[in-house]
């Protein structure tokens, strides 16, 4: 059995990658070890950027129909001190603050619902073979592709499949990553975390004081800066909760109801439906590529469920890698394009880890160590009010970008990362923030499947130069003459080259740009 790409791991990232490839006329085989989707409610906090991916993959309506939480609940939550019913609380993690910079909105639904939607879409494409109940065993690389051995998870048959490329989307313990010898850098926190899934109507009633909120974080002096995170699964009393527990904790030797009720701040009825554990550690692969083998999602980077960074980052891995594999398939990729996958995605997660996840833990730890209402009430309340009046930096300053990418025409010495300030100015290496066009046209819908040149001044010579730089090489380019759209002041550039993943490859002056040089760099020549 052959395909253009073999994907090991049929979770959300693997299937999303397969869909993206299918939209670019590439066939894939997805090898998934489980027979059915795992019914654990994680990966729920989906960003507006992920909403753009859903729009690109053609699943927005299905995603919204699958969500068990009304859209009126929004994307924000509540942070509290000590427990969820504390007198000290404030609005927290409101991703709606930055929605104007995206062509979609936030979504919230359990990961298994997202997977169901993506699998249905995958089946519609006619280009994806999903092999459920099969496990990866080994891979051999040669000059023109890979040969992969798989076996049925429950024992029995084995098969050999081949393709030009293999992508491991097979989780934090990735067998694909291990098979090709990709090493990891691990930041251990030596904490055991418990994930509890449960039903409690009384909790619904207790938290009604906050109105329509779906997520809650109790910053407890007993937790050393680690989150006690509570998330609503639906409106039928189903919730999930995660928090640190003592080393050696098992399902049998620990009182999880007591832990939960302490975090809530009241006795509630609890019916547990799932109890699981994981080690709190942050892992980052040292490269995302070894020859013709790539890794994405948790196989490339894993961390505790802080802020929904995992699934959203994994989806962005898929968008980034898909267009580059498609460029190779189409014969227009430069020699260095595939290397740019690691060059772009690796520093983004390194920054996410250091500047958001670890920073959040350390800042919360410093707060609970420095302030306590029983020790100095005035000092505590002043510090708490400063937190409450902040700019929600976990949201407003989270801006993944590729300023330092070798395939972006940016400033010399720039560094890629995940921090920044949202805005509409077109910046090389940044996501294109869409603006409305006259006559209610949607700029996002006008962007081509390949590169798109936005000509904001109607410069015919510019258009001819870019056409000449792309057409002979078969590089897909859509040219949009937007001279009448009034976007020059908004974007701060006369022309913008947008990549297939809607990041900006170049922005600048129309008259003196080297179109051939820009295209060469953007395609990794």
Regions found by a protein language model. Name each.
Residues 63, 120, 138, 145, ...:
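Conserved FAD-binding catalytic core of PHBH/FMO-like flavoproteins
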Residues 124-136:
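A conserved beta-strand/loop element that lines the FAD pocket in flavoprotein oxidoreductases
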């Amino acid at each position: 059995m052959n395909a253009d790409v073999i994907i090991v791991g049929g979770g959300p990232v693997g299937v999303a990658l397969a869909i993206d490839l299918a939209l670019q006329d590439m066939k894939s085989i997805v090898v998934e070890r489980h027979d059915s989707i795992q019914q654990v409610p994680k990966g729920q906090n989906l960003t507006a950027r992920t909403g753009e991916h859903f729009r690109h993959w053609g699943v927005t309506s299905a995603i919204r129909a699958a969500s068990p939480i009304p859209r009126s609940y929004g994307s924000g939550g509540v942070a509290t001190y000590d427990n969820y019913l504390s007198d000290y609380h404030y609005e927290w993690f409101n991703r709606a603050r930055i929605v104007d910079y995206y062509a979609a909105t936030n979504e919230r639904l359990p990961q298994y619902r997202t997977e169901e939607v993506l699998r249905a879409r995958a089946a519609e494409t006619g280009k994806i073979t999903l092999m459920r109940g099969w496990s990866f065993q080994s891979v051999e690389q040669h000059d023109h592709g890979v040969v992969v051995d798989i076996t049925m998870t429950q024992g029995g048959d084995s098969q050999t499949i081949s393709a030009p490329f293999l992508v491991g989307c097979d989780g934090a313990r990735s067998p694909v990553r291990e098979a090709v010898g990709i090493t990891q850098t691990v930041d251990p926190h030596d904490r055991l975390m418990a994930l509890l899934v449960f039903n409690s109507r009384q909790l619904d009633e207790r938290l009604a004081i906050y109105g329509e909120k779906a997520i809650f974080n109790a910053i407890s002096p007993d937790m050393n800066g680690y989150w006690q995170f509570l998330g609503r699964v639906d409106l039928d009393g189903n919730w999930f909760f995660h928090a640190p527990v003592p080393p050696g904790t098992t399902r049998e030797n620990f009182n999880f109801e007591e832990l939960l009720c302490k975090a809530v701040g009241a006795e509630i009825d609890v019916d547990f439906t799932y109890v699981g554990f994981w080690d709190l550690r942050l892992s980052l692969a040292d490269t995302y590529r070894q020859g013709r083998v790539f890794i994405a999602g948790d196989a490339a980077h894993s961390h505790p469920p802080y802020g929904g960074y995992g699934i959203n980052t994994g989806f962005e891995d898929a968008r980034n890698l898909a267009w580059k594999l498609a460029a190779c398939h189409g014969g227009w990729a430069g020699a260095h394009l595939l290397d740019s996958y690691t060059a772009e995605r690796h520093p983004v997660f390194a920054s996410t880890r250091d500047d958001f996840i670890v920073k959040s833990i350390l800042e919360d730890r410093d707060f609970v160590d420095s302030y306590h209402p029983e020790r100095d009430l005035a000092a505590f309340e002043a510090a708490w009010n400063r937190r409450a009046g902040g700019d929600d930096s976990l949201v407003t300053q989270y801006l993944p970008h590729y300023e330092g990418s070798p395939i972006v025409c940016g400033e010399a010495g720039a560094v890629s990362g995940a921090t920044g300030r949202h805005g509409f100015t077109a910046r090389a290496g940044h996501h294109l923030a869409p603006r409305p066009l006259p006559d209610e046209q949607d700029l996002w819908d006008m962007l081509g499947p390949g590169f798109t040149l936005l000509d904001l001044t109607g410069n015919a010579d510019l258009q001819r130069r870019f056409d000449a730089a792309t057409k002979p090489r078969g590089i897909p380019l859509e040219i949009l003459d937007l001279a009448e759209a009034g976007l020059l002041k908004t974007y701060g550039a006369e022309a913008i080259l947008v990549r297939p993943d809607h990041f900006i490859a170049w922005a600048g002056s129309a008259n003196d740009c080297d179109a051939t040089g820009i295209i060469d760099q953007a395609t990794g020549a």
